[in-house]
Amino acid sequence: NIILAAVKAEGTTVIRNAAKEPEIVDLQNFLVRMGAKVQGAGESTVVVEGVKQLYGVEYDPLKDRIEAGTFLIAAATCGGEIETKGVFSENIAALLHKLRENGCKIHTKNDKIILWSDGRLKSVDLVRLCN
């Protein structure tokens, strides 16, 4: 939200300890296509130079990686095969690693992920790390 406000604010806004999620990078890409001056999305510092006007563009935003992960986990748990499109494997690499540890077979190519599971998952250790 700060990036969105800063785009139309006068002067330069520096955001420190910024979120680094892929969606933030995608937001920067979208805003830049509209004429905004945003640098550093995906890094800890984002610099936004306010502009007077933004322009309409056509843009295909990132697909929801949380939603894709939910469907992958459901298929892993219930057994069967699922294919997701529009989510890049590097954006959910930790989840895919754990699903493989669970015993799922996973194939990735570009923005396509195919998961197969017999529904008999192995237990794995999960640890949440904070940045």
What is each stretch, according to the model?
Residues 1-131:
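Short, structured segments at the rim of ligand-binding sites
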